[in-house]
Amino acid sequence: MALTAHPSCLLALLVAGLAQGIRGPLRAQDLGPQPLELKEAFKLFQIQFNRSYLSPEEHAHRLDIFAHNLAQAQRLQEEDLGTAEFGVTPFSDLTEEEFGQLYGYRRAAGGVPSMGREIRSEEPEESVPFSCDWRKVASAISPIKDQKNCNCCWAMAAAGNIETLWRISFWDFVDVSVQELLDCGRCGDGCHGGFVWDAFITVLNNSGLASEKDYPFQGKVRAHRCHPKKYQKVAWIQDFIMLQNNEHRIAQYLATYGPITVTINMKPLQLYRKGVIKATPTTCDPQLVDHSVLLVGFGSVKSEEGIWAETVSSQSQPQPPHPTPYWILKNSWGAQWGEKGYFRLHRGSNTCGITKFPLTARVQKPDMKPRVSCPP
């Protein structure tokens, strides 16, 4: 009986071999003795992610981009300070500019609306649990969604926030309509991007949201198709607030009340596969945030190598490595991307601007707490 391997496994092996020789800008014709390996890796990429191209010229163009992105993944691997792994992803045949146009949004956030803010600066800092993962509460987090070519991460993050709060607060397992947020948005730009508060304003204006079942996602804005009173509302919000730009406070709130939305710089995500991203402000500017996601937990991981780092002095004893603290984030690019649709960012260094817009809806009175505690 012949042995077979899944395309993703073969692709990983081929890419690992190619990466050993990649150190600079790369095109298909620059590979010298390696063109067959590159072409085979690209063929497996097409099979795994169901890619086809309209002409030989387009195929050659995408092959060049694929080769360039292999080199870029290698550079990211060398620059990252965490445990992240970069390589072939569903977006490996896109240029950085194309990826940004499809999934990022660079609108200046000067129009931040007036909203409530969490004011706790005079209170002593409370302890934060070692870890918190709302995914471990049965059905608390709705399934991973795929925004496809509609740049609506802002709407999907807001919908995920509302769904989760209803699930952990009231045991009401609803999936709310992202399409209603797109069709009825009065502040956002639909599939051209927006901010999470745009979605929350629409929810307040519409007195709630219909279900995903009644008002399903179409992947595009439908002009003159906003019918906020046509379908029964299954979830609504009291208001929304901006949390303090402090990772300790964000962790406290997350563990106590549930997942929140954050808006980050998505630059390292195009070629991300798994692990904890720890980028520097130079490689991932915390001021240039362009992608909204749902923050669902936090924890720590030991050094992947599992070895003790030697100190500068040869006479000193080796010291155990410090654990790497991380945030767990739910993305909206489908379950084939990242860690089954999730990813992790370093916690404690404002990686990729995670503290810039920590925003959440509220679906209950401020003095009430959810009926469920966040499991470690």
From Swiss-Prot:
Disulfide bonds join 150-191, 184-226, 284-352. CDD domains: Peptidase_C1A. It is an enzyme of class 3 (hydrolase). PROSITE patterns: THIOL_PROTEASE_ASN, THIOL_PROTEASE_HIS. It is found in: Endoplasmic reticulum. May have a specific function in the mechanism or regulation of T-cell cytolytic activity. Residues 22-127 form a propeptide. The active site is at 153, 291, 331. This is Cathepsin W. It comes from the Eukaryota. GO terms for cellular component: endoplasmic reticulum; extracellular region; extracellular space; lysosome; membrane; platelet dense granule lumen. It holds the Pfam family Peptidase_C1. The gene is CTSW. Keywords: Disulfide bond, Endoplasmic reticulum, Glycoprotein, Hydrolase, Protease, Signal, Thiol protease, Zymogen. Glycans are attached at residues 50, 205. Its EC number is 3.4.22.-. Expressed predominantly in natural killer cells, and in cytotoxic T cells. Belongs to the peptidase C1 family. GO terms for molecular function: cysteine-type endopeptidase activity; cysteine-type peptidase activity. Residues 1-21 form the signal peptide. Its main location: endoplasmic reticulum.
